[in-house]
Amino acid sequence: MSKKNIRIQVIIECTEHKNSGLSGTSRYVTTKNKKNNPERLELKKYNSILNRKTIHKEIK
């Protein structure tokens, strides 16, 4: 029998870009381990529209 898969795909979206009012969105798709990280994921990723690294948070 195979084990249940605990790694799930999540979408992370830029918080600074959302508040800036500019058009478009900066989103990434990544995976996380539900067992080790039950809370929402927060990573610093590159935003090509703002041309810098910004904080991206997990969305539902």
Curated annotation (Swiss-Prot):
Matching SUPFAM superfamilies: Zn-binding ribosomal proteins (SSF57829)
Source organism, top-level taxon: Bacteria
Keywords recorded for this protein, A-Z: Ribonucleoprotein, Ribosomal protein
One Pfam assignment: Ribosomal_L33
GO BP, sorted A to Z: translation
GO CC list: cytoplasm; ribonucleoprotein complex; ribosome
HAMAP family for this protein: Ribosomal_bL33
Protein name in the entry: Large ribosomal subunit protein bL33
Organism of derivation: Karelsulcia muelleri (strain GWSS)
